[in-house]
Amino acid sequence: SSPLSQPAQSILITTITNDKLIVRPENIGFFKYDSERKLWRVVLNSLQHFILKHQTTAETILNYAPEFIQIHKTYIININYLYLISENSCTLLPPFNKVSELKVSKMYKKKLLDRFYDM
């Protein structure tokens, strides 16, 4: 059976203020990289967001759960919320449907499309 069919494990995320968040992957819409501050931020389905600790890398995030997929050097989404892939951006399902900033870069697009069609 595929890893997506098993009950999702909760993941432990450490914020920049050293708080520990225990979150289920299905409560996470996407991660966004703040290039200026060089920090990742997680956006939850409550639309709260938290800044992750400095040592967090894209690789760290991608290893949290199989449903996280990188779409741009500054964005990692939860593919289970993916609704639409257009030319160079993607739209997520509610409550993230108002988020219009999710850019898809050429480098990650093929992998994203492959994953999307495999669902």
Language model feature labels by segment:
Residues K111-M119:
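C-terminal output/interaction extensions
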Residues S2-N97:
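Conserved binding/recognition cores within well-folded domains
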